[in-house]
């Protein structure tokens, strides 16, 4: 499939009746009494507003019935409410609904504001995980962990060399990373991603060889039910792999 065919496939999913299509189409919530936000790091989406473990077998620390899935950084979501203590927001993402820690969300004006921030080229994380270098001037991006499938807007064309917080961007991509301000609102801060990192500009070509290579990058890591333990379960593995080709 070409990039154009993948885009048409993504659009066609909105036409399939059922809950999955309803979730994918966040635009249906425009104009309603909802707030909007963006994940500022990989975070958990929970069935209830608590981070307490709820294993189906007593003492099993690899299981949690309340863990639904993981949300990658820079994912938009509709905010439908919050817990009594304000620690969790009830959200809808493009593929799941549940509760997300409020500290992992940056508030934005609306879905269009997020889309505007994504305009232009983007960098796709194609490695299992990419960890950014330490930044003593901007702790919100320092050492940021970016899982496979994460998409970040480019802040400049590849090859651009300029100063950023005391460093020159030689051999780095310049990207915009979502962060949460002190007042809870979303802000994008520039950061550097080394050209040696396992990333690509745009999406990978959708070939059998590339799909196999992407899946192989996760061999041997811990199975994480719903994204627990920093790992992936079966659906997250498939989802993160296919995001690298532009599938939603």
Model region roles, listed by residue range:
Residues 68-70:
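Signature of short aromatic-glycine-proline-rich micro-motifs recurring in repeat-based ectodomains
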Residues 1-46, 50-62, 72, 76-78, ...:
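Boundary regions of SH3-family modules and the immediately adjacent low-complexity/disordered segments
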Residues 208-248:
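Catalytic cores of peptidoglycan-degrading enzymes
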Residues 66, 161-163, 225-227:
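Generic recognition of flexible, low-complexity loop/linker segments
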């Amino acid at each position: 499939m070409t990039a154009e065919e993948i885009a048409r496939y993504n659009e066609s999913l909105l036409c399939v009746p059922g809950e999955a299509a309803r979730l994918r189409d966040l635009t249906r919530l425009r104009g309603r009494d909802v707030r909007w936000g963006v994940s500022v790091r990989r975070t958990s989406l929970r069935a209830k507003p608590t981070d307490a473990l709820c294993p189906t077998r007593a003492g099993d620390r690899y299981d949690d019935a309340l863990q639904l899935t993981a949300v990658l950084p820079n994912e938009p979501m509709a905010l439908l409410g919050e817990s009594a203590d304000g620690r969790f927001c009830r959200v809808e993402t493009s593929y799941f609904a549940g509760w997300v820690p409020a500290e992992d969300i940056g508030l934005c004006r609306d879905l269009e504001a997020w889309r505007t921030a994504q305009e232009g080229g983007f960098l796709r994380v194609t490695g299992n995980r990419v960890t950014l270098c330490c930044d003593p001037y901007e702790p919100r991006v320092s050492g940021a962990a970016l899982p496979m499938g994460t998409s970040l807007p480019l802040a400049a064309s590849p090859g651009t060399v300029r100063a950023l917080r005391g460093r020159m961007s030689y051999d780095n991509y310049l990207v915009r990373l979502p962060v949460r301000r002190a007042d809870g609102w979303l802000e994008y801060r520039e950061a550097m991603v080394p050209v040696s990192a396992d990333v690509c500009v745009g999406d990978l070509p959708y070939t059998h060889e590339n799909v196999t290579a992407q899946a192989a990058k996760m061999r041997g890591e811990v199975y994480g039910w719903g994204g627990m333990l920093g790992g992936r379960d079966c659906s997250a593995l498939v989802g993160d792999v296919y995001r690298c080709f532009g599938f939603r």
